[in-house]
């Protein structure tokens, strides 16, 4: 199945021996659209595949389970798919990446799935978002360089597109008014002076 995008197309065609896949989902707009695309692929081409949602709930972002669940229920409503049991675990903010890696490793050891997907996107260019490059704490610290979508046992279908490309996927797939509103697209931490996780961001 081909998902076209002006920044980078994504084609998914999993081998027939892959029948269980993991999906890292936070409740944000990026992982939500990957969730929808995978569900659409499963429903239309590979009904033998089970998608297993995985959420690491950071201690400074306690809303992640709530919004991840909202996304899953909406995608089930839109596609008719039934997800596998939602796997989630509390993780420490200061060890967020390491704790998530350990969590995923434990799920692989249980042979719950053969590979997993994540909704990591590309960073905008410095010309498009100079403010992100002037704040030392603003840019993500994980590797978001332009790279192959396939890497080892995980897949990053959005790694070569930025937030505008994500919005384009929502528009092309016709879910901007149905799926996007149930996502949590802005960052908030429980230590923030204004901790309002119910106010949505604009695209």
Regions found by a protein language model. Name each.
Residues 1-203:
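Nucleotide-activated chemistry modules centered on ATP-dependent adenylation/adenylyltransferase
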């Amino acid at each position: 199945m081909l998902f076209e995008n002006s920044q980078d197309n994504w084609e998914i065609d999993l081998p027939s021996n892959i029948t269980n896949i993991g999906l890292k989902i936070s409740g944000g707009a990026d992982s939500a659209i990957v969730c929808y695309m995978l569900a659409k692929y499963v429903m239309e081409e590979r009904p033998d595949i089970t998608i297993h949602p995985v959420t690491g709930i950071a201690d400074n972002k306690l809303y992640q389970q709530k919004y991840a669940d909202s996304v899953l229920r909406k995608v089930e409503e839109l596609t008719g798919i039934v997800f596998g049991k939602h796997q989630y675990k509390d993780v420490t903010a200061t060890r967020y990446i390491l704790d998530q890696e350990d969590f995923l490793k434990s799920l692989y050891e249980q042979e719950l799935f053969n590979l997993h997907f994540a909704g990591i996107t590309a960073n905008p260019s410095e010309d498009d978002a100079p403010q992100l490059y002037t704040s030392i704490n603003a840019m993500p610290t994980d590797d978001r360089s332009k790279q192959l979508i396939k890497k080892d046992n995980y897949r990053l279908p959005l790694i070569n597109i930025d937030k505008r490309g994500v919005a384009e996927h929502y528009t092309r797939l016709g879910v901007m008014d149905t799926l996007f509103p149930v996502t949590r697209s802005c960052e908030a931490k429980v230590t923030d002076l204004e901790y309002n996780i119910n106010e949505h961001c604009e695209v």
